């Protein structure tokens, strides 16, 4: 499980792009 999973709950797309 990554952190992104928690933030992704609200905006997976945005969170994924911001992580990159």
UniProtKB/Swiss-Prot annotation:
GO molecular function annotation: lipid binding
UniProt keyword Transport present: yes
Protein origin, superkingdom: Eukaryota
Alphabetical keyword list: Allergen, Lipid-binding, Transport
Protein family membership: Belongs to the plant LTP family.
Annotated function: Plant non-specific lipid-transfer proteins transfer phospholipids as well as galactolipids across membranes. May play a role in wax or cutin deposition in the cell walls of expanding epidermal cells and certain secretory tissues.
Protein's UniProt name: Non-specific lipid-transfer protein
């Amino acid at each position: 499980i990554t952190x992104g999973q928690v933030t992704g709950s609200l905006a997976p797309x945005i969170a994924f792009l911001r992580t990159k």
